[in-house]
């Protein structure tokens, strides 16, 4: 109203009409505002009642939620205490189980170690048993061979007596043959001076053949075995009527040399046999004592590893091949026509 300008009136009627119209206008506006206010008040009362009802519901819900919150807090505290108690018990149980596991592992390692030691000891005992069995079998075999060899040497001792007689006779015949050969050589020297050149050459060839035959070491095995024991008719004594041929003289000398070598070989073998019999008796007594001690020590729990090699492996059996005098590297070679004597 202040902003509206009051018009100028020409007459009082116009001014009265203007103010009447304006009052009616304001009155209508007042009526409309009153109606709106009544409607607003009614709506606000309804809204207030509704809000109060909602507030009551909200307060009730809030109280319920607070009660639930308190209950949940109590449950949380209870569960927390239970969890801590359960965690402490679980920690103690885990600690006990870890201790039991460590002890069980230690016991398991000890048992594995003990099993390995038992297996190793069992293997060592089995190896010692096999070595002992093999050594005993080898010793029995060599003992049987030695017994057979002793029997064979005893038979050769019997043959030696007859051979000595034959050798002595052949020595006498060889001495006579050498004397006769010396006489023949002197006769050939005399005849060589008076004979022509061609007979001289023949005599020289004959002398060289005789000297070569005398320097021969031994006859072959076949010839030696065939002519080892000649009959008295094959070798005369040098004083008979029929002279010996050069080939007969050479074969007789070779037979004598072979017999002398055989006699020497038999003497060396007899000495070796005596030494072997002495060593065998000493070894037999030592082996029996060692076998009894090894059988008594086999009842123990363990064998040290170096002790598993028995006496038979080192000295008792190999002594036949290495340490026995007369039977090892210094064994004489067998004479032609005779069997070798070896264990």
UniProtKB/Swiss-Prot annotation:
<keyword id="KW-0175">Coiled coil</keyword>
<dbReference type="GO" id="GO:0032418">
    <property type="term" value="P:lysosome localization"/>
</dbReference>
<protein>
    <recommendedName>
        <fullName>Nuclear distribution protein nudE-like 1</fullName>
    </recommendedName>
</protein>
<dbReference type="GO" id="GO:0010975">
    <property type="term" value="P:regulation of neuron projection development"/>
</dbReference>
<dbReference type="GO" id="GO:0007059">
    <property type="term" value="P:chromosome segregation"/>
</dbReference>
<feature type="region of interest" description="Disordered">
    <location>
        <begin position="322"/>
        <end position="343"/>
    </location>
</feature>
<dbReference type="GO" id="GO:0000776">
    <property type="term" value="C:kinetochore"/>
</dbReference>
<feature type="region of interest" description="Disordered">
    <location>
        <begin position="184"/>
        <end position="204"/>
    </location>
</feature>
<keyword id="KW-0597">Phosphoprotein</keyword>
<dbReference type="GO" id="GO:0005871">
    <property type="term" value="C:kinesin complex"/>
</dbReference>
<dbReference type="InterPro" id="IPR006964">
    <property type="entry name" value="NUDE_dom"/>
</dbReference>
<keyword id="KW-0493">Microtubule</keyword>
<dbReference type="GO" id="GO:0051642">
    <property type="term" value="P:centrosome localization"/>
</dbReference>
<dbReference type="GO" id="GO:0047496">
    <property type="term" value="P:vesicle transport along microtubule"/>
</dbReference>
<dbReference type="GO" id="GO:0008017">
    <property type="term" value="F:microtubule binding"/>
</dbReference>
<feature type="coiled-coil region">
    <location>
        <begin position="25"/>
        <end position="190"/>
    </location>
</feature>
<dbReference type="GO" id="GO:0007020">
    <property type="term" value="P:microtubule nucleation"/>
</dbReference>
<comment type="similarity">
    <text>Belongs to the nudE family.</text>
</comment>
<dbReference type="GO" id="GO:0016477">
    <property type="term" value="P:cell migration"/>
</dbReference>
<dbReference type="GO" id="GO:0005819">
    <property type="term" value="C:spindle"/>
</dbReference>
<dbReference type="GO" id="GO:1900029">
    <property type="term" value="P:positive regulation of ruffle assembly"/>
</dbReference>
<keyword id="KW-0813">Transport</keyword>
<dbReference type="GO" id="GO:0051303">
    <property type="term" value="P:establishment of chromosome localization"/>
</dbReference>
<dbReference type="GO" id="GO:0005874">
    <property type="term" value="C:microtubule"/>
</dbReference>
<keyword id="KW-0963">Cytoplasm</keyword>
<comment type="function">
    <text>Required for organization of the cellular microtubule array and microtubule anchoring at the centrosome. Positively regulates the activity of the minus-end directed microtubule motor protein dynein. May enhance dynein-mediated microtubule sliding by targeting dynein to the microtubule plus end. Positively regulates lysosome peripheral distribution and ruffled border formation in osteoclasts.</text>
</comment>
<dbReference type="Pfam" id="PF04880">
    <property type="entry name" value="NUDE_C"/>
</dbReference>
<dbReference type="GO" id="GO:0005737">
    <property type="term" value="C:cytoplasm"/>
</dbReference>
<dbReference type="GO" id="GO:0007100">
    <property type="term" value="P:mitotic centrosome separation"/>
</dbReference>
<dbReference type="InterPro" id="IPR033494">
    <property type="entry name" value="NUDE"/>
</dbReference>
<dbReference type="GO" id="GO:0000132">
    <property type="term" value="P:establishment of mitotic spindle orientation"/>
</dbReference>
<keyword id="KW-0206">Cytoskeleton</keyword>
<dbReference type="GO" id="GO:0005813">
    <property type="term" value="C:centrosome"/>
</dbReference>
